[in-house]
């Protein structure tokens, strides 16, 4: 889907550092967690952050 904007990456990394145990490799589960943890009003931004977090969880060997 292309390169993510820096604000998506920084928000995703911050969420993983603070609430890493809450996330898993499932996008739908991560959407709900991002909605609960953050105050992001935009559905599109929330989904992009959840997608970035899901991708990080699935591709980072230590998180598997």
From Swiss-Prot:
The keyword Ribonucleoprotein applies. It comes from Methanocorpusculum labreanum (strain ATCC 43576 / DSM 4855 / Z). It holds the Pfam family Ribosomal_S17e. Belongs to the eukaryotic ribosomal protein eS17 family. GO terms for molecular function: structural constituent of ribosome. SUPFAM superfamilies: Rps17e-like (SSF116820). This is Small ribosomal subunit protein eS17. GO terms for cellular component: ribonucleoprotein complex; ribosome. The keyword Glycoprotein does not apply. Keywords: Ribonucleoprotein, Ribosomal protein. Coiled coil: none annotated. GO terms for biological process: translation.
